[in-house]
A protein has these predicted regions:
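Single-stranded RNA-binding regions, centering on S1/OB-family and related RNA-binding modules
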Residues: 1-158
Length: 158
């Protein structure tokens, strides 16, 4: 048996790097949630909440490219499977569902709500220097900053 990476420096995953994991099986735990059991290249198993990635159409007994999102102070590894359509740093066009305002702690931001390829609704903050008026029904070009829990985090292109 291989001990977890935080005890054994030869078998250590690094934050921000992408590795190929084996999707071994889907299990349902006592909390009623389905989890993917993923095995890293060093033979260590990790569990990943399935509901965030259901739309990816991942199947057991397949290889899945995952980025190590972060490793917390207890050594728990947080993985982000590679999105089948969006890649960080690329641009894509999204349909606008709604435009409006969101109040933050000490300010009010203009925001738009867009839909991604899987019909997830994603909020995008409009930068203050952006002067165009964006209406529902329009299409906007956004840059994918990163993927978090199966959804792209977007910024509006000027």
């Amino acid at each position: 048996m291989i001990i977890p990476g935080y005890y054994d420096l030869k078998h250590k995953l690094e934050e921000g790097k992408t590795y190929i994991f084996s999707f071994l099986k889907l299990v349902t735990l006592a909390d009623g949630e389905a989890y993917m059991v993923m095995e890293d290249p060093f033979g260590i198993r990790h569990m990943l909440l399935y509901r965030y990635y259901k739309q990816y159409d991942l199947q057991p007994d397949t290889a899945v490219r995952c980025r190590v999102d972060r490793i917390n102070c207890t050594g728990r590894v947080f993985l982000e499977p590679e999105h089948p359509f969006y890649k960080p740093g690329t641009s894509a066009v999204f349909p606008v569902i709604r435009a409006g305002f969101r109040s933050a702690e000490y300010s009010v931001n203009r925001v738009i709500l867009v839909k991604d390829i899987f019909d997830n609704e994603i909020e995008v903050v409009i930068p203050p220097e952006y002067r165009d008026n964006i209406m529902a029904g329009a299409r906007v070009e956004c840059t994918v900053k990163l993927i978090r829990k199966g959804r792209p985090v977007l910024s509006l292109n000027p």
